[in-house]
Amino acid sequence: MSQPALLKVSQARKVFGGLVALDNVSLSIEAGQIYGLIGPNGAGKTTFFNVITGLYAPDGGSFQIEGRPYQPTAVHRVAEAGIARTFQNIRLFPDMTALENVMVGRHLRTHGLHQGVFGAILRTRAFQQGEARIRSHAHALLDYLGIGRYADSIAKTLSYGDQRRLEIARALATEPRLLALDEPAAGMNATEKNSLRETLEKIRDDGKTILIIEHDVKLVMGLCDRVTVLDYGKVIAEGSPAEVQRHPDVIEAYLGSGATHG
């Protein structure tokens, strides 16, 4: 018996006034995939992310996590369902250290239940032990993302690429089932993009599932297992990267007539 999809979205709909931003969008992401979501500017990609991560309430559709109904109506429910995301514009705590940023993510995962208010005030043994575990886990994630040497550096002093990696480390600290990345390669040079690709492949190979929005078509096609293409809020193609690149509607709407060459 086959396992249910990690995330299944059916007929998702979102309307802003008279604008239909998502027009019955459906997709299914299997565990262990890197899944790409692409399309022209204004196609509905970020709106879709905002719906499945609880920032926008959907106006229609059904959502499932591993076959169970999922209502993305609030950010805390999204975290409980096992979805973590990054944003197109970096949203770190700029004046905190890299280590502290990741520890914040870990605190979200543990909900602070190991300490309680009085434990934090009195710095009880349980509080101190919990903090030590969180700190150790955060160090391990920074090492995993290749930025362990910057643990004590202030986040805003890191390079752009390393700030992106720090965002991913913080998201991974919540131990998500699905890691949703909104344009993680934005602003990166070619070397940084190659490093990002290797990092995401490692995360996938270690058992995580990734959903990625990205404008760099070459990166998406070389990285993703499956790709969905949106245009004006509608799905116009879905399949393997090779299938999507050959789809005439995709070529016309997004990739350009030379996309299948070179």
Regions found by a protein language model. Give the residues of each.
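Glycine-rich phosphate-binding loops of nucleotide-dependent enzymes
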Residues: 2-262
